[in-house]
């Protein structure tokens, strides 16, 4: 619990309507998408950068833990207050789009802006912000930067880090820094903005983001390839991507995911398929679209594709992407709890990774539906637990073997979900002692009292 003097300070600073210690608010901010619960000591909603600075300065002086929070949509516990402390939420007030500069193709936003809302606003100006995580309708841009969120457009357009031009960040001691510039080129000084991206709130609190925008492509079209064997689908991915065609998206669902989506939504997916690939291309003329789809179909069929369907209208387009976006919730038919992680490997290693997952599934007796962003090698593996109390420990062992498989294939523990709490103990699998010490020293230099989001990322 917070001492009375701390409670009074925060109430005086932001007002009683923006600081809470009652159980209702603490319960509302004690969990994220992992469904784990850790009760904070208080919840505060700063109105501006100055208040963030004063909050952090005070907390640093009094050694009070601060957990920055966007929408709480993360899958790794990054926004959980595991040892009490103060949840600093940006969703209530810091949700404004400050500027959309159509001449320079940049935008300035506050960290609480919802990703999908931002996309909609820039599209009104025929502009395009590509990063589109599955949580786009809930997640904040500040959270996206803190996790380096990806999405389905990553195959062609990259991920959040590719669009962050500059940040304003409040450090643990309350000091405010600028990192990066509005310019396309900037090699003056260290890349501090790059350090803050994917730092999960451990190094500072983001108060403003400058993002790069693109001109919106006028045309797009999607298609689905059907494969009897998942290995064929994975081979088709890297061979297509290395052929000169660059699809906007290259997504997959395995057989278990297909069946789950069909059981829940009946979208007409081929339930007996080993896997499907859902792809999208864009361009400025119809001939460009047609050529890309023709090339993709050619490479798919050369690698075992037994059916190729091009979406002919908006409804078919929406149905394809609805199926992919709702795969995560659909697989709940296989168990009461899922261990959901997002390992990433080089694209050519996808067949080997999925083979290892199949072996681990058989070894432990778990259903492990997989889907994800194969265009950038990012696979969402989901270990389904029918009896969480009985199976949790065994499930963690199975997931550790999946992590080991990804690392052995020169991959990584996480492509976009981050490390947070759920993967913190596995960091030594991916990094040696010297590398982990470097991370800890960076953390200590910027947050010597360890008040910002402690225990995350294995730090």
Placement of each model-derived feature along the sequence:
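N-terminal accessory segments
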Residues: 1-32, 61-64, 299-317, 408-409, ...
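N-terminal flexible segment immediately upstream of the FAD-binding catalytic core
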Residues: 1-57, 73-105, 134, 255-266, ...
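C-terminal substrate-recognition/cap domain of FAD-linked oxidoreductases
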Residues: 20-29, 215, 226-229, 234-398, ...
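Glycine-rich tight-turn/loop motif centered on a GG-T
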Residues: 38-45, 87, 106, 336-344, ...
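Conserved, mostly hydrophobic/aromatic
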Residues: 59, 381, 447
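FAD-binding subdomain of flavoenzyme oxidoreductases
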Residues: 96-251, 452
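Activity-critical C-terminal alpha-helical subdomain
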Residues: 175, 424-459
């Amino acid at each position: 619990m917070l001492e009375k003097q701390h409670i009074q300070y925060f109430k005086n600073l932001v007002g009683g309507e923006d600081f809470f210690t009652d159980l209702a608010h603490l319960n509302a901010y004690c969990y994220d998408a992992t469904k784990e619960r850790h009760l904070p000591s208080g919840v505060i909603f700063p109105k501006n950068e100055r208040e963030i600075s004063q909050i952090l300065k005070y907390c640093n002086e009094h050694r009070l833990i601060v957990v920055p929070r966007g929408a709480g949509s993360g899958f790794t516990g990054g926004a959980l207050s595991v040892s009490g402390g103060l949840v600093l939420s940006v969703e209530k007030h810091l949700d404004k789009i400050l500027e959309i500069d159509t001449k320079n193709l940049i935008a300035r936003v506050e960290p609480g802006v919802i990703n999908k809302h931002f996309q909609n606003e820039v599209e009104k100006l025929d502009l395009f912000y590509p990063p589109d995580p599955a949580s786009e309708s809930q997640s904040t841009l500040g959270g996206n930067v803190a996790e380096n969120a990806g999405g389905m457009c990553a195959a062609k357009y990259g991920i959040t880090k590719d669009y962050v031009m500059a940040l304003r960040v409040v450090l643990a001691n309350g000091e405010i820094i600028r990192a990066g510039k509005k310019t396309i080129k900037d090699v003056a000084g260290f890349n501090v903005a790059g350090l803050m991206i994917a730092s999960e709130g451990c190094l500072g609190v983001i108060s403003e983001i400058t993002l790069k925008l693109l001109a919106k492509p006028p045309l797009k079209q999607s298609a689905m390839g059907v494969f009897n064997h998942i290995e064929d689908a994975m081979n088709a991915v890297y061979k297509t991507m290395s052929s000169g065609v660059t699809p906007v998206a290259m997504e997959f669902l395995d057989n278990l995911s297909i069946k789950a989506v069909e059981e829940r939504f009946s979208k007409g997916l081929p339930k007996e398929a080993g896997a499907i690939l859902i792809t999208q291309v864009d361009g400025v003329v119809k001939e460009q679209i047609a050529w890309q789809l023709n090339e993709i179909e050619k490479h798919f069929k050369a690698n075992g594709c037994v059916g190729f369907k091009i979406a002919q209208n908006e409804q078919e387009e929406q149905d394809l992407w609805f199926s992919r976006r709702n795969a995560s919730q659909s697989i709940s038919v296989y168990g009461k709890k899922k261990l959901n992680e997002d390992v990433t490997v080089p694209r050519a290693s996808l067949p080997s990774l999925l083979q290892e997952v199949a072996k681990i599934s058989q070894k432990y007796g778990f259903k492990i539906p997989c889907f994800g962003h194969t265009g950038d090698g990012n696979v969402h593996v989901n270990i389904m637990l029918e009896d969480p109390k009985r199976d949790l420990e065994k499930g963690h062992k199975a997931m550790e073997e999946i992590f080991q498989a990804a690392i052995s294939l020169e991959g990584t523990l996480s492509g976009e979900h981050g490390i947070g709490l759920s993967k913190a103990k596995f960091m030594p699998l991916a990094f040696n002692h010297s590398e982990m010490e470097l991370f800890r020293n960076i953390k200590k230099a910027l947050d010597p009292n360890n008040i910002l989001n402690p225990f995350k990322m294995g730090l």
